[in-house]
Amino acid sequence: MTKKQENETSKELGMDNKKTSGKSGKLKISVSAIRKGEKKTEGKRSNARRRANNHSNDHSKRRRPAAQDLLKDLKQKQRADEARLDQESKAAKQEYKKSLNKAEASESKPVVKKVESVEKPAETAAEAPKVRGPKILKPSPARLKQNQANSEKPAAKPSSSRRPSSRPSFTEAPMPENKEGRRRKSGKPGRKGQNSYADQGRGANSNRSEQRKRKNKKHQSAPQVKKQVTQRKDRPLPESFEYEVGMNAQDLGKILHREPAEIVKKLFMLGIMINQNRSLDKDTIELLAADYGIEAVEKVHEDISDIDNIFAQEMEESKNSENQVVRPPVVTIMGHVDHGKTTLLDRLRHTRVSEHEAGGITQNIGAYQVRINDRLITFLDTPGHAAFSSMRARGAEITDIVVLIVAADDGVMPQTIEAIDHAKSAGVPIIVAINKMDRPGANPAHVTEQLMQYELIPENYGGSTIFVNISAKTGMGIDELLENIILEADMLELKADPKQKAIGTVVEARLSRGKGPVADVLIQQGTLRVGDPIVVGDTFGRVRTMTNDKGHQVKKATPSMPVEITGLNDVPESADKLVVFADEKTARAVGEARAQQSLQKQRENVQHVTLDNLFDTMKRESMKSVDIVLKADVQGSAEALAQSFQKIDVEGVRVNIIHSGVGAINESDVTLASASNALIIGFNVRPTATAKSQAAQEGVDIRLYSIIYKAIDDVKAAMQGMLEPTYEEKVIGNLTVRETWKVSKIGTIAGAFVDNGYVTRESGIRVIRDGVVKYDGKVASLRRFKDDVKEVKAGFDCGLTIENFNDIKEGDELEAYEMQEVKPG
């Protein structure tokens, strides 16, 4: 055999001549090297057989004896190498098993030791196989000696301060192979070993799992009390429980150890539909307790629904508070109608409110704050007409000082006497202002003599009442009046605690189309803030917005400050008390309870027919009645009209107020009036377009008024059968304001489009904003382009001005009307 053939044969058998020639030492074998060597050898064998077969098939005819001998020698060498490799593999496996058994006997944790190298006889370059595998780190002799000594020692208990590592070394010793040639792990056949990265990770996870098992076993063996957590539904029901009116399903679920959904379901089975957040009354809670078979006891506490009692307690606590500060005085201007109350207030505020009021009289309470010489004064302007007696009474109750206006040329009148009585019953001081001193017929001495009959004696006559002669029109005596107001306030030592919860009184209330229920409130103690949960009379809510008397939104309102608030669930009554509660839940419960009490009182006031009152009932039913559906712009006006109608005394006829409310006249009002054959009276409000057409179809009479005594006179005349009008108001056109211009010496010019009908220069005109009449007057001028015209018909633009009114805005509706004669018959 030539040298070249020998080299080729050596390469085919996987032998490296450079590594094996001249060496007669020990051959280090690892499991991975053996396995790779076997695979490579097997591959070499198959390749050699394939080449041999191909060679024999292709060149069988040309085969020479030398080639046959060479092939025979190669096969013999292959068989010899296979036998030798099998013996070496078996020896390595046996050695590894011995080391494993020895490590398990010496220590509790498996320690993988390095398998000693297997001696291999020296081979020639042609005989040594080529084995490739991972490089095996050879430990130092000192390390081997230490490992051997540790394996012979008995296993020591791990110290409590430092636990031994449970991770085995993955590179110190090869893993053995099973009969199928696959590596096994921890004695489990068919699993991969720990030489690859994946095997090392799985080994680490296995060790961590063993650590967790040992830790759990240790905790289980230790005497430890395990915390038991029981669910709410598994806990037994109490024998009895204490409840409060207003609790919801969630609150009851916590007490009864039941889920809120179960409470809702049980009440549903009992015929009561609720949700988890709805407040429950006493009967519902007791019914639920009876169904569970337990006793329910109502918690005894102070009646928080008694707003008047809470209001009185808060007022008393504020007097003894250490946080009291000086507050502005609340001054109410009272007197007879048309004696100059609003004119005086206009002089103080530098405004012209009285010019915009229908008939020149005030018909609701207005609250304003005026700063005079760095001092704030809150003024309340009350109506002077006889119909507004309740408004004057409310003004006297919430005021500190009453300024009584008496006209010098008119003297004491009925409403003047009524104002004196209201002030005396409220126990507030009175300052008399004798107005209209600029008129020729002014006689202040006569007025003084008249007032002395009602125990109002001036200081110069030895009394204690302050008298001031003024002229609201010219400004005479105004400074002296203000000085006396401030002096009287200082003597009263008016103080309040701004840190306590706010309390106040409703001055006026109404329903706004864009804002909803609106209440004008005077804060008397504490500070009201946006977001506070409040109860106002029978209504409740959370303060959404607050607006001061100048129309600016504010975040808080201090004592003696009038504000307009929104956020209530309904329109409150005038003179209702406002109280702030800790949370909205309590406020809701109190408001609902008060509404229920009010409804119960209304039911109790219904007079049922009995044998005792049968005759009176028959007599009353035989009387003729004027049924009225009453709608007004504010709550106070509706209340005043209803009281005035009830006071009309006509024999054989009575007034029956079917419904009273605030806001524009709508379809529901027309339907109610049609069903009951009633008359609709609107005070400073207008019907909607749908309501107007429905009323025309159903023949419902709608009467609109802006002055209260005209409404009272018409109702009285109708009751007496004397209402035979010779003139009737007829709407002749409707306009929409598209633009406005302000021109000096002229005022505000409205550019309007005539939607239907027509408008003339002599027609009356009403300004309607959001369904409420803002002004009723006459057309001052009417133009098309630059020409004055007498009439503008539908479909054309025009420019017009209104007498004594400049507060015209884009989007306002204008209603043109004429008074036409009605022919009898």
UniProtKB/Swiss-Prot annotation:
Low complexity: bias regions: 158-169
Subcellular location: Cytoplasm
Main location: cytoplasm
Annotated region described as G2, given as residue ranges: 360-364
Region entry G3, spans: 381-384
Keywords annotated in UniProt: Cytoplasm, GTP-binding, Initiation factor, Nucleotide-binding, Protein biosynthesis
Gene Ontology MF terms: GTP binding; GTPase activity; translation initiation factor activity
Span list, region G4: 435-438
Binding positions for GTP per the UniProt entry: 335-342, 381-385, 435-438
Region described as G5: 471-473
Coiled coil: none
Pfam families cross-referenced by the UniProt entry: EF-G_D2 (PF22042), GTP_EFTU (PF00009), IF-2 (PF11987), IF2_N (PF04760)
Region feature (Disordered): 1-239
Function in brief: One of the essential components for the initiation of protein synthesis. Protects formylmethionyl-tRNA from spontaneous hydrolysis and promotes its binding to the 30S ribosomal subunits. Also involved in the hydrolysis of GTP during the formation of the 70S ribosomal complex.
HAMAP family documented for this protein: IF_2_B
Record protein name field: Translation initiation factor IF-2
UniProt organism field: Lactobacillus delbrueckii subsp. bulgaricus (strain ATCC BAA-365 / Lb-18)
Gene: infB
